[in-house]
Protein backbone atom coordinates (compact mmCIF):
# COMPACT_ATOMS: atom_id res chain seq x y z
CA UNK A 1 0.00 0.00 0.00
CA UNK A 2 3.04 2.32 -0.16
CA UNK A 3 1.98 3.77 -3.51
CA UNK A 4 -1.53 4.36 -2.21
CA UNK A 5 -0.27 6.03 0.95
CA UNK A 6 1.98 8.28 -1.15
CA UNK A 7 -1.03 9.47 -3.15
CA UNK A 8 -3.06 10.03 0.00
CA UNK A 9 -0.27 12.09 1.56
CA UNK A 10 -1.33 14.87 -0.81
CA UNK A 11 -4.45 17.01 -0.61
CA UNK A 12 -7.89 15.76 -1.58
CA UNK A 13 -8.45 17.24 -5.10
CA UNK A 14 -11.33 19.54 -4.20
CA UNK A 15 -10.40 22.22 -6.74
CA UNK A 16 -10.39 19.71 -9.61
CA UNK A 17 -13.81 18.50 -8.49
CA UNK A 18 -15.08 22.09 -8.38
CA UNK A 19 -13.88 22.66 -11.95
CA UNK A 20 -15.59 19.47 -13.11
CA UNK A 21 -18.85 20.66 -11.57
CA UNK A 22 -18.35 24.13 -13.09
CA UNK A 23 -18.00 22.64 -16.56
CA UNK A 24 -21.32 20.83 -16.19
CA UNK A 25 -23.01 24.01 -14.93
CA UNK A 26 -22.06 26.04 -18.01
CA UNK A 27 -25.21 25.08 -19.89
CA UNK A 28 -27.31 26.32 -16.96
CA UNK A 29 -25.65 29.77 -16.76
CA UNK A 30 -26.41 31.18 -20.22
CA UNK A 31 -23.10 33.02 -20.15
CA UNK A 32 -23.79 34.63 -16.77
CA UNK A 33 -21.29 34.57 -13.90
CA UNK A 34 -22.17 32.42 -10.93
CA UNK A 35 -21.18 30.72 -7.71
CA UNK A 36 -21.62 27.35 -6.09
CA UNK A 37 -22.65 27.54 -2.45
CA UNK A 38 -22.58 24.44 -0.24
CA UNK A 39 -22.93 23.86 3.49
CA UNK A 40 -21.45 21.17 5.68
CA UNK A 41 -23.60 19.10 7.99
CA UNK A 42 -24.67 20.97 11.12
CA UNK A 43 -23.89 19.87 14.64
CA UNK A 44 -27.12 18.41 16.00
CA UNK A 45 -28.02 17.08 19.42
CA UNK A 46 -29.85 13.86 20.13
CA UNK A 47 -33.47 14.56 21.02
CA UNK A 48 -33.90 15.21 24.76
CA UNK A 49 -30.14 14.84 25.26
CA UNK A 50 -27.02 17.00 25.24
CA UNK A 51 -24.96 14.49 23.23
CA UNK A 52 -24.42 15.17 19.52
CA UNK A 53 -25.96 12.99 16.84
CA UNK A 54 -23.20 10.86 15.24
CA UNK A 55 -21.72 13.09 12.56
CA UNK A 56 -21.77 12.30 8.86
CA UNK A 57 -20.47 14.95 6.51
CA UNK A 58 -22.64 16.09 3.63
CA UNK A 59 -21.20 14.47 0.53
CA UNK A 60 -21.63 17.40 -1.91
CA UNK A 61 -19.75 19.66 0.48
CA UNK A 62 -16.94 17.16 0.99
CA UNK A 63 -16.62 16.55 -2.75
CA UNK A 64 -15.81 20.24 -3.31
CA UNK A 65 -13.75 20.80 -0.15
CA UNK A 66 -12.28 17.60 1.28
CA UNK A 67 -13.18 19.10 4.66
CA UNK A 68 -14.74 16.91 7.38
CA UNK A 69 -15.59 19.81 9.72
CA UNK A 70 -19.18 20.46 10.76
CA UNK A 71 -20.88 23.87 10.58
CA UNK A 72 -18.71 24.99 7.66
CA UNK A 73 -19.55 26.15 4.14
CA UNK A 74 -17.90 26.95 0.82
CA UNK A 75 -18.25 29.37 -2.06
CA UNK A 76 -16.83 28.63 -5.50
CA UNK A 77 -16.76 31.58 -7.89
CA UNK A 78 -17.28 29.95 -11.28
CA UNK A 79 -15.93 32.87 -13.29
CA UNK A 80 -12.87 33.56 -11.14
CA UNK A 81 -12.11 29.89 -10.39
CA UNK A 82 -11.76 30.78 -6.72
CA UNK A 83 -12.73 28.30 -4.00
CA UNK A 84 -13.27 29.70 -0.51
CA UNK A 85 -13.79 27.56 2.57
CA UNK A 86 -15.49 29.01 5.63
CA UNK A 87 -14.92 27.30 8.99
CA UNK A 88 -16.40 28.13 12.40
CA UNK A 89 -14.60 30.75 14.49
CA UNK A 90 -13.21 29.92 17.90
CA UNK A 91 -15.94 29.54 20.53
CA UNK A 92 -14.28 30.07 23.94
CA UNK A 93 -16.93 28.02 25.74
CA UNK A 94 -16.45 25.10 23.35
CA UNK A 95 -12.67 25.23 23.83
CA UNK A 96 -13.19 24.38 27.51
CA UNK A 97 -14.65 21.01 26.54
CA UNK A 98 -13.16 20.16 23.18
CA UNK A 99 -9.89 22.05 22.88
CA UNK A 100 -8.90 24.52 20.20
CA UNK A 101 -10.48 23.97 16.78
CA UNK A 102 -8.62 24.05 13.49
CA UNK A 103 -7.39 27.52 12.60
CA UNK A 104 -7.80 29.15 9.19
CA UNK A 105 -4.05 28.81 8.64
CA UNK A 106 -4.14 25.09 9.40
CA UNK A 107 -7.13 24.62 7.11
CA UNK A 108 -5.38 26.50 4.30
CA UNK A 109 -2.45 24.09 4.56
CA UNK A 110 -4.62 21.00 4.76
CA UNK A 111 -7.31 21.55 2.12
CA UNK A 112 -7.16 22.17 -1.62
CA UNK A 113 -8.83 25.60 -1.53
CA UNK A 114 -7.74 29.11 -2.50
CA UNK A 115 -8.52 30.78 0.80
CA UNK A 116 -10.03 30.05 4.20
CA UNK A 117 -12.20 32.46 6.16
CA UNK A 118 -14.47 32.08 9.18
CA UNK A 119 -18.22 31.65 8.81
CA UNK A 120 -18.94 35.10 10.29
CA UNK A 121 -17.42 36.52 7.09
CA UNK A 122 -19.74 34.59 4.77
CA UNK A 123 -22.44 37.15 4.04
CA UNK A 124 -20.02 40.02 3.47
CA UNK A 125 -18.06 37.78 1.09
CA UNK A 126 -21.21 36.85 -0.82
CA UNK A 127 -22.17 40.53 -1.11
CA UNK A 128 -18.71 41.38 -2.40
CA UNK A 129 -18.84 38.63 -5.05
CA UNK A 130 -22.33 39.71 -6.15
CA UNK A 131 -21.17 43.31 -6.49
CA UNK A 132 -18.06 42.34 -8.46
CA UNK A 133 -20.29 40.65 -11.04
CA UNK A 134 -22.62 43.62 -11.36
CA UNK A 135 -25.65 41.83 -9.97
CA UNK A 136 -25.68 39.33 -12.83
CA UNK A 137 -24.36 36.28 -10.96
CA UNK A 138 -26.43 33.15 -10.33
CA UNK A 139 -26.09 31.35 -6.99
CA UNK A 140 -26.31 27.57 -7.39
CA UNK A 141 -27.26 25.81 -4.15
CA UNK A 142 -29.03 22.65 -2.98
CA UNK A 143 -32.60 22.86 -1.73
CA UNK A 144 -33.04 22.39 2.02
CA UNK A 145 -29.28 22.72 2.58
CA UNK A 146 -29.05 26.50 3.02
CA UNK A 147 -29.21 28.16 6.44
CA UNK A 148 -31.79 30.89 6.99
CA UNK A 149 -28.99 33.28 7.91
CA UNK A 150 -27.29 32.96 4.51
CA UNK A 151 -27.96 36.02 2.34
CA UNK A 152 -27.82 36.13 -1.45
CA UNK A 153 -28.44 39.86 -1.81
CA UNK A 154 -27.28 41.16 -5.17
CA UNK A 155 -27.50 37.86 -7.05
CA UNK A 156 -29.76 37.72 -10.09
CA UNK A 157 -31.07 34.25 -9.23
CA UNK A 158 -30.79 31.53 -6.62
CA UNK A 159 -31.02 28.20 -8.46
CA UNK A 160 -31.70 25.22 -6.20
CA UNK A 161 -32.75 22.72 -8.86
CA UNK A 162 -29.64 21.64 -10.79
CA UNK A 163 -26.56 21.58 -8.52
CA UNK A 164 -27.36 18.37 -6.66
CA UNK A 165 -27.81 16.39 -9.87
CA UNK A 166 -24.69 17.87 -11.45
CA UNK A 167 -22.54 16.92 -8.45
CA UNK A 168 -24.04 13.44 -8.30
CA UNK A 169 -23.23 12.82 -11.96
CA UNK A 170 -19.72 14.26 -11.54
CA UNK A 171 -19.06 11.78 -8.74
CA UNK A 172 -19.53 8.74 -11.00
CA UNK A 173 -16.02 8.90 -12.50
CA UNK A 174 -13.32 8.70 -9.85
CA UNK A 175 -9.88 10.30 -10.07
CA UNK A 176 -6.62 8.75 -8.89
CA UNK A 177 -7.00 10.13 -5.37
CA UNK A 178 -10.51 8.77 -4.96
CA UNK A 179 -9.48 5.34 -6.25
CA UNK A 180 -6.64 5.38 -3.71
CA UNK A 181 -9.13 6.11 -0.92
CA UNK A 182 -11.36 3.26 -2.09
CA UNK A 183 -8.37 0.93 -2.33
CA UNK A 184 -7.35 1.86 1.22
CA UNK A 185 -10.88 1.24 2.49
CA UNK A 186 -10.81 -2.15 0.78
CA UNK A 187 -7.42 -3.03 2.24
CA UNK A 188 -8.61 -2.29 5.77
CA UNK A 189 -11.88 -4.12 5.19
CA UNK A 190 -10.04 -7.18 3.84
CA UNK A 191 -8.11 -7.36 7.12
CA UNK A 192 -11.40 -7.09 8.98
CA UNK A 193 -12.99 -9.89 6.93
CA UNK A 194 -10.04 -12.13 7.76
CA UNK A 195 -10.50 -11.29 11.44
CA UNK A 196 -14.20 -12.12 11.14
CA UNK A 197 -13.42 -15.48 9.50
CA UNK A 198 -11.06 -16.34 12.34
CA UNK A 199 -13.55 -15.17 14.97
CA UNK A 200 -16.12 -17.61 13.60
CA UNK A 201 -14.06 -20.51 15.02
CA UNK A 202 -15.02 -19.76 18.60
CA UNK A 203 -18.04 -17.47 18.21
CA UNK A 204 -21.42 -18.66 19.43
CA UNK A 205 -23.35 -15.57 18.30
CA UNK A 206 -23.35 -13.37 15.19
CA UNK A 207 -22.48 -10.30 17.27
CA UNK A 208 -19.05 -11.71 18.13
CA UNK A 209 -18.16 -11.88 14.44
CA UNK A 210 -19.49 -8.37 13.89
CA UNK A 211 -17.40 -7.15 16.82
CA UNK A 212 -14.22 -8.65 15.38
CA UNK A 213 -14.89 -6.93 12.05
CA UNK A 214 -15.56 -3.49 13.50
CA UNK A 215 -12.64 -3.65 15.94
CA UNK A 216 -10.21 -4.48 13.14
CA UNK A 217 -11.52 -1.61 11.01
CA UNK A 218 -11.05 0.89 13.83
CA UNK A 219 -7.59 -0.42 14.68
CA UNK A 220 -6.52 0.10 11.07
CA UNK A 221 -7.89 3.61 10.62
CA UNK A 222 -11.47 3.14 9.43
CA UNK A 223 -13.39 4.50 12.40
CA UNK A 224 -16.77 4.42 10.67
CA UNK A 225 -18.62 1.66 8.87
CA UNK A 226 -19.84 2.25 5.32
CA UNK A 227 -23.20 0.79 6.41
CA UNK A 228 -24.58 -1.35 9.18
CA UNK A 229 -22.76 -4.71 8.87
CA UNK A 230 -24.71 -7.79 7.86
CA UNK A 231 -23.63 -10.89 9.78
CA UNK A 232 -26.17 -13.57 8.94
CA UNK A 233 -25.80 -17.21 9.93
CA UNK A 234 -27.73 -20.08 8.37
CA UNK A 235 -31.10 -19.18 6.88
CA UNK A 236 -30.62 -15.55 7.96
CA UNK A 237 -28.35 -15.26 4.93
CA UNK A 238 -31.44 -15.36 2.70
CA UNK A 239 -32.45 -11.93 4.07
CA UNK A 240 -30.65 -9.47 1.80
CA UNK A 241 -30.26 -6.64 4.32
CA UNK A 242 -30.40 -8.68 7.52
CA UNK A 243 -29.52 -6.38 10.41
CA UNK A 244 -30.17 -8.20 13.68
CA UNK A 245 -26.65 -9.65 14.01
CA UNK A 246 -27.63 -11.27 17.29
CA UNK A 247 -28.61 -14.83 16.45
CA UNK A 248 -26.99 -17.93 17.87
CA UNK A 249 -24.73 -19.95 15.59
CA UNK A 250 -26.23 -23.16 17.00
CA UNK A 251 -29.11 -24.72 15.09
CA UNK A 252 -31.90 -25.36 17.64
CA UNK A 253 -33.16 -28.35 15.63
CA UNK A 254 -29.89 -30.24 15.27
CA UNK A 255 -28.05 -28.66 18.23
CA UNK A 256 -25.11 -28.36 15.84
CA UNK A 257 -23.45 -25.25 14.47
CA UNK A 258 -25.25 -23.72 11.51
CA UNK A 259 -23.69 -24.29 8.12
CA UNK A 260 -22.33 -20.89 7.19
CA UNK A 261 -22.24 -17.17 7.91
CA UNK A 262 -22.72 -14.46 5.30
CA UNK A 263 -20.75 -11.30 6.15
CA UNK A 264 -21.55 -8.17 4.15
CA UNK A 265 -19.49 -5.37 5.66
CA UNK A 266 -17.07 -2.61 4.77
CA UNK A 267 -15.18 0.11 6.56
CA UNK A 268 -15.31 3.78 5.60
CA UNK A 269 -11.95 5.49 5.18
CA UNK A 270 -11.89 9.29 5.04
CA UNK A 271 -15.45 9.35 3.74
CA UNK A 272 -14.95 6.65 1.06
CA UNK A 273 -16.56 3.23 1.32
CA UNK A 274 -15.74 -0.42 0.94
CA UNK A 275 -18.59 -2.89 0.39
CA UNK A 276 -17.49 -6.53 0.54
CA UNK A 277 -19.43 -9.76 1.04
CA UNK A 278 -18.01 -13.15 1.91
CA UNK A 279 -19.52 -16.44 3.07
CA UNK A 280 -17.65 -18.63 5.53
CA UNK A 281 -18.23 -22.15 6.86
CA UNK A 282 -18.98 -22.14 10.57
CA UNK A 283 -17.45 -25.56 11.16
CA UNK A 284 -14.32 -24.84 9.15
CA UNK A 285 -15.46 -26.66 6.01
CA UNK A 286 -18.34 -25.98 3.64
CA UNK A 287 -21.11 -28.57 3.57
CA UNK A 288 -21.74 -30.20 0.19
CA UNK A 289 -24.84 -28.11 -0.49
CA UNK A 290 -23.24 -24.81 0.50
CA UNK A 291 -20.14 -25.58 -1.55
CA UNK A 292 -22.28 -26.33 -4.60
CA UNK A 293 -24.06 -23.00 -4.34
CA UNK A 294 -20.83 -21.17 -3.52
CA UNK A 295 -19.21 -22.52 -6.68
CA UNK A 296 -22.14 -21.28 -8.78
CA UNK A 297 -21.98 -17.79 -7.27
CA UNK A 298 -18.21 -17.59 -7.62
CA UNK A 299 -18.58 -18.54 -11.29
CA UNK A 300 -21.24 -15.86 -11.70
CA UNK A 301 -18.93 -13.25 -10.25
CA UNK A 302 -15.81 -14.39 -12.12
CA UNK A 303 -17.51 -14.28 -15.51
CA UNK A 304 -19.21 -10.95 -14.83
CA UNK A 305 -16.02 -9.23 -13.69
CA UNK A 306 -14.29 -10.51 -16.84
CA UNK A 307 -16.90 -8.65 -18.93
CA UNK A 308 -16.09 -5.25 -17.43
CA UNK A 309 -14.53 -2.48 -19.50
CA UNK A 310 -15.42 1.01 -20.62
CA UNK A 311 -18.79 1.13 -22.36
CA UNK A 312 -20.09 -2.27 -21.31
CA UNK A 313 -23.87 -2.34 -20.89
CA UNK A 314 -24.51 -3.11 -17.23
CA UNK A 315 -27.85 -4.75 -18.01
CA UNK A 316 -25.99 -7.25 -20.21
CA UNK A 317 -23.62 -8.14 -17.38
CA UNK A 318 -26.53 -8.56 -14.98
CA UNK A 319 -28.39 -10.78 -17.45
CA UNK A 320 -25.27 -12.90 -17.89
CA UNK A 321 -25.16 -13.47 -14.13
CA UNK A 322 -28.68 -14.88 -14.34
CA UNK A 323 -27.64 -17.16 -17.21
CA UNK A 324 -24.77 -18.59 -15.15
CA UNK A 325 -27.08 -19.05 -12.15
CA UNK A 326 -29.65 -20.89 -14.27
CA UNK A 327 -27.03 -23.27 -15.69
CA UNK A 328 -25.72 -24.01 -12.22
CA UNK A 329 -29.14 -24.62 -10.70
CA UNK A 330 -30.05 -26.84 -13.65
CA UNK A 331 -26.95 -28.96 -13.01
CA UNK A 332 -27.99 -29.41 -9.39
CA UNK A 333 -31.55 -30.27 -10.36
CA UNK A 334 -33.11 -27.39 -8.44
CA UNK A 335 -34.29 -26.01 -11.75
CA UNK A 336 -35.52 -28.14 -14.63
CA UNK A 337 -36.38 -27.35 -18.22
CA UNK A 338 -34.72 -25.34 -20.98
CA UNK A 339 -32.28 -22.57 -20.03
CA UNK A 340 -33.70 -20.03 -22.47
CA UNK A 341 -37.26 -20.68 -21.34
CA UNK A 342 -36.34 -20.35 -17.66
CA UNK A 343 -34.52 -17.10 -18.45
CA UNK A 344 -37.43 -15.65 -20.43
CA UNK A 345 -39.92 -16.62 -17.71
CA UNK A 346 -37.66 -14.87 -15.15
CA UNK A 347 -37.72 -17.90 -12.83
CA UNK A 348 -34.13 -17.24 -11.75
CA UNK A 349 -35.32 -14.04 -10.06
CA UNK A 350 -36.74 -16.30 -7.34
CA UNK A 351 -33.17 -17.22 -6.40
CA UNK A 352 -31.34 -14.01 -7.42
CA UNK A 353 -33.84 -11.19 -6.76
CA UNK A 354 -31.53 -8.17 -6.51
CA UNK A 355 -29.32 -6.24 -8.92
CA UNK A 356 -25.78 -7.33 -9.70
CA UNK A 357 -24.23 -4.24 -8.17
CA UNK A 358 -24.12 -0.49 -7.70
CA UNK A 359 -21.72 2.41 -7.98
CA UNK A 360 -19.43 2.89 -5.00
CA UNK A 361 -17.74 6.00 -3.65
CA UNK A 362 -18.55 8.34 -0.79
CA UNK A 363 -21.85 6.49 -0.47
CA UNK A 364 -22.23 2.72 -0.45
CA UNK A 365 -25.00 3.01 -3.01
CA UNK A 366 -23.25 5.85 -4.79
CA UNK A 367 -24.83 8.44 -7.02
CA UNK A 368 -25.39 8.52 -10.77
CA UNK A 369 -26.75 5.02 -11.33
CA UNK A 370 -30.14 6.11 -12.75
CA UNK A 371 -32.09 3.06 -11.49
CA UNK A 372 -35.65 2.36 -12.59
CA UNK A 373 -37.44 0.85 -9.62
CA UNK A 374 -40.76 0.92 -11.50
CA UNK A 375 -39.45 -1.36 -14.26
CA UNK A 376 -42.07 -4.02 -14.97
CA UNK A 377 -39.32 -6.50 -15.80
CA UNK A 378 -38.57 -8.14 -12.45
CA UNK A 379 -35.07 -9.13 -13.56
CA UNK A 380 -34.02 -5.48 -13.83
CA UNK A 381 -36.30 -3.71 -11.34
CA UNK A 382 -33.72 -3.58 -8.54
CA UNK A 383 -30.69 -2.96 -10.74
CA UNK A 384 -29.18 0.19 -9.19
CA UNK A 385 -27.13 1.09 -12.28
CA UNK A 386 -28.58 1.32 -15.77
CA UNK A 387 -26.71 1.98 -19.00
CA UNK A 388 -23.07 1.84 -20.07
CA UNK A 389 -20.25 1.99 -17.54
CA UNK A 390 -17.70 4.79 -18.03
CA UNK A 391 -13.99 4.30 -17.43
CA UNK A 392 -13.15 5.45 -13.92
CA UNK A 393 -16.44 4.36 -12.41
CA UNK A 394 -16.27 1.99 -9.45
CA UNK A 395 -18.93 -0.68 -9.22
CA UNK A 396 -19.70 -3.59 -6.94
CA UNK A 397 -20.09 -7.03 -8.48
CA UNK A 398 -22.20 -9.00 -6.02
CA UNK A 399 -24.13 -11.93 -7.47
CA UNK A 400 -25.96 -14.23 -5.11
CA UNK A 401 -28.17 -17.28 -4.86
CA UNK A 402 -30.68 -17.36 -2.01
CA UNK A 403 -33.20 -19.76 -0.56
CA UNK A 404 -35.81 -17.42 0.89
CA UNK A 405 -39.16 -19.14 1.38
CA UNK A 406 -41.12 -15.88 1.19
CA UNK A 407 -39.69 -15.13 -2.27
CA UNK A 408 -39.51 -18.64 -3.73
CA UNK A 409 -42.84 -20.10 -2.57
CA UNK A 410 -44.98 -17.85 -4.83
CA UNK A 411 -43.00 -19.19 -7.80
CA UNK A 412 -43.69 -22.74 -6.61
CA UNK A 413 -47.40 -22.01 -6.30
CA UNK A 414 -47.64 -20.28 -9.67
CA UNK A 415 -48.68 -22.49 -12.62
CA UNK A 416 -46.45 -20.32 -14.82
CA UNK A 417 -43.25 -21.17 -12.97
CA UNK A 418 -43.72 -24.21 -10.70
CA UNK A 419 -42.89 -26.67 -13.46
CA UNK A 420 -39.36 -25.28 -13.58
CA UNK A 421 -38.60 -25.90 -9.88
CA UNK A 422 -38.01 -29.36 -8.40
CA UNK A 423 -39.15 -28.99 -4.81
CA UNK A 424 -37.75 -32.36 -3.77
CA UNK A 425 -34.24 -31.20 -4.67
CA UNK A 426 -34.88 -27.69 -3.38
CA UNK A 427 -35.72 -29.01 0.09
CA UNK A 428 -32.07 -29.99 0.58
CA UNK A 429 -30.92 -26.36 0.21
CA UNK A 430 -33.15 -24.27 2.48
CA UNK A 431 -30.59 -24.39 5.31
CA UNK A 432 -27.92 -22.90 3.06
CA UNK A 433 -29.74 -19.59 3.45
CA UNK A 434 -27.90 -17.42 0.97
CA UNK A 435 -24.54 -17.09 -0.73
CA UNK A 436 -23.33 -13.72 -2.01
CA UNK A 437 -19.80 -12.80 -3.08
CA UNK A 438 -19.04 -9.10 -3.54
CA UNK A 439 -15.99 -7.23 -4.79
CA UNK A 440 -15.37 -3.55 -5.61
CA UNK A 441 -14.08 -3.01 -9.13
CA UNK A 442 -12.74 -0.01 -11.07
CA UNK A 443 -13.82 0.03 -14.71
CA UNK A 444 -10.92 0.88 -17.05
CA UNK A 445 -10.72 1.59 -20.78
CA UNK A 446 -9.84 -1.99 -21.68
CA UNK A 447 -10.81 -3.96 -18.60
CA UNK A 448 -10.96 -3.57 -14.85
CA UNK A 449 -9.00 -3.24 -11.60
CA UNK A 450 -10.39 -5.27 -8.69
CA UNK A 451 -9.78 -3.34 -5.45
CA UNK A 452 -10.91 -6.18 -3.19
CA UNK A 453 -8.32 -8.55 -1.76
CA UNK A 454 -10.41 -10.33 0.89
CA UNK A 455 -10.09 -14.12 0.46
CA UNK A 456 -12.80 -15.85 -1.57
CA UNK A 457 -11.18 -19.06 -2.83
CA UNK A 458 -12.74 -22.01 -0.99
CA UNK A 459 -9.46 -23.54 0.16
CA UNK A 460 -8.19 -20.21 1.52
CA UNK A 461 -11.41 -19.48 3.41
CA UNK A 462 -11.51 -22.98 4.89
CA UNK A 463 -7.87 -22.70 5.94
CA UNK A 464 -8.49 -19.36 7.70
CA UNK A 465 -11.63 -20.72 9.35
CA UNK A 466 -9.60 -23.31 11.26
CA UNK A 467 -6.29 -21.45 11.71
Curated annotation (Swiss-Prot):
Highest rank taxon of the organism: Eukaryota
InterPro entries: Aminopep_P_N, Creatin/AminoP/Spt16_N, Creatinase/aminopeptidase-like, Pept_M24, X-Pro_dipept-like
GO biological process, one term: proteolysis
SMART domains in UniProt: AMP_N (SM01011)
Its EC number(s): 3.4.11.9
Record's keyword annotation contains S-adenosyl-L-methionine: no
Gene3D superfamilies for the chain: Creatinase/methionine aminopeptidase superfamily, Creatinase/prolidase N-terminal domain
Keyword Hydrolase recorded: yes
Catalytic activity entry: Release of any N-terminal amino acid, including proline, that is linked to proline, even from a dipeptide or tripeptide
MF (Gene Ontology): manganese ion binding; metalloaminopeptidase activity
Pfam families per UniProt: AMP_N, Peptidase_M24
Cofactor remark: Binds 2 manganese ions per subunit.
Family assignment from sequence similarity: Belongs to the peptidase M24B family.
Protein's recorded name: Probable Xaa-Pro aminopeptidase pepP
Source organism per UniProt: Neosartorya fischeri (strain ATCC 1020 / DSM 3700 / CBS 544.65 / FGSC A1164 / JCM 1740 / NRRL 181 / WB 181) (Aspergillus fischerianus)
